[in-house]
Amino acid sequence: MTLAKALGSGAPLGAFLTKEFCSVLEPGDHGSTFGGNALTTAAGAAAAKVIVDEDIPELANETGAYFQGKLNGLSEKYEFITEVRGMGLLIALQMNIDIAGAAVTAALPEGLLINAVRPNMIRFMPPLNVTRDEIDEAVAILDKVLEETSK
């Protein structure tokens, strides 16, 4: 498995993970431009410590459940919302009408960044430290946007 991007919390850090029985690389077999950098390794260790100490996975699950609950509330208002699904804070809202692109365009000037992954599907990927107040604000904007774009 390869890991990168958030691993160093903004510092250029990547990792390659494998089971011990897959270990075939010997020292000197592989090199990279960012290999062995003490600063980025320290950043990665600090990021991992925060993830464990603050139980970020559980926080993401709890906050994601709250977000999905709010989106399910919108599905009661708008019959064209057919499904809300996700894991943690990676959430999708599926519709039976193709307004995702228009919703993205309408949401941006309101301060909400969302992604149309299909013509009928919006993806939400907020930061792991998103607050319930920010989720409430996002859902209020989305409510307004869906009302406008579904006419």
Name the predicted role of every residue range.
Residues 1-151:
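Conserved N-terminal phosphate-binding loop of PLP-dependent enzymes in the Aspartate aminotransferase
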